[in-house]
A protein has these predicted regions:
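Active-site beta->alpha loop and helix N-cap motifs at the rims of alpha/beta catalytic domains
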Residues: 2-146
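Generic structural "secondary-structure junction" signal
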Residues: 14-18, 54-55, 113, 141, ...
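A general structural signal for well-ordered alpha-helical segments in protein cores
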Residues: 27, 60, 64, 89, ...
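Catalytic alpha/beta core domains of metabolic enzymes, predominantly
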Residues: 128, 142-249
Length: 301
């Protein structure tokens, strides 16, 4: 299978005003920035970092329309169409396809904790309901369900399920999925602190939230590791980037820190929507120091 999707994709933030209304103008401008200046190969609105769970159906549709309009076909837009039931997710997925999405990002339904067999039937129904590629999103830390390699192998037999974003944090998963599935499914790194390891094991892409704040560094790391196979140079850059990635993943406030980092790097995207809150002064000060250290470490590189 030739890969339609590869490279660095943003798990796109959803900009908000100070009143926690979706800021569609900033969303369009930010999407354009990520493509034109950041050099990203794709965008994914309505993922975890995009706070899809906090948006109304009308807002979700408007976010997709705004992102597609801003992108104007320059890069693929995969839309997160997650929800609580198969019926609801099919409706979101069909809507995204109709609006012009290039693909879908699908996690396990939240809260209900379906079994592997129930998950297979769930994803098969979605697969049969749409005609665009599906990227599975395995993030048991958020869904409570781990889509293990044997289930991924079964799902890879379905026509539209062609990718998986692997976010377990298990360093063996990328190689195990590739060993089992071969060319039937392509793996995207979904755990920032295992990015280089994932690329060395055969991942063809990277979906990240921190990429919103540091797009050029992410793209450069991917180029060094995947395009150039220059793992020595990639490792040097990766070790400089790791303190930022580790802080974001380990703080327990991922979306909050990503939005704060965007503002610190000159692209304010507003606060998260409650119940999430903007980071406090102490956290913001620490984040600012980490970002400044990274800037100094890569200056001139």
């Amino acid at each position: 299978m030739d890969s339609l999707f590869e490279g660095v994709y943003s798990a796109l933030v959803t900009p908000m005003t100070v009143d926690e209304e979706v800021d569609y103008q900033t969303l369009g401008e930010f999407a354009n920035y990520l493509i034109e200046e950041g050099g990203l190969q794709g965008l994914i609105p309505l993922g975890s970092t995009g706070e899809y769970y906090a948006l109304s159906d009308q807002e979700r549709e408007a976010v997709v329309k705004t992102t597609l309009a801003a992108t104007a076909g320059r890069v693929p837009v995969l839309v997160g169409t997650n929800g609580g039931s198969t019926r609801q997710i099919i409706a979101y997925s069909r809507q995204a396809e109709t609006l012009g999405a290039a693909g879908l990002l699908l996690a396990a339904p939240y809260y209900s904790l379906p079994t592997p067999d129930e998950l297979y039937r769930h994803f098969k129904r979605i697969n049969d309901a749409v005609g665009i590629p599906i990227m599975l999103y395995n993030y048991p830390g958020r869904t409570g369900v781990d889509m293990k390699p044997d289930l991924i192998e079964r799902l890879a037999e379905l026509d539209n399920i062609q990718y998986v974003k692997e976010s377990t944090g298990d360093a063996t998963r990328v190689s195990e999925i590739i060993r089992r599935c071969g060319e039937q499914i392509k793996v995207f790194c979904g755990c920032d602190t295992l990015a280089l390891e994932s690329f060395m094991m055969g991942a063809v892409g990277w979906v990240g939230g921190v990429v919103n704040a540091l797009p050029k560094a992410h793209v450069r790391l991917f180029e060094l590791a995947v395009d150039n196979k220059d793992f020595m140079a990639a490792r040097k850059l990766y070790y400089k980037l790791l303190p930022v990635l580790s802080l974001m993943e380990g703080a327990g406030q991922y979306t909050q820190f990503v939005k704060a980092a965007c503002a610190m790097n000159g692209h304010p995207v507003g606060p998260p929507r409650r119940p999430l809150c903007a980071v406090g002064d102490e956290e913001a000060s620490h984040l600012k120091k980490i970002l400044a250290s990274f800037d100094m470490a890569v200056s001139g590189v």
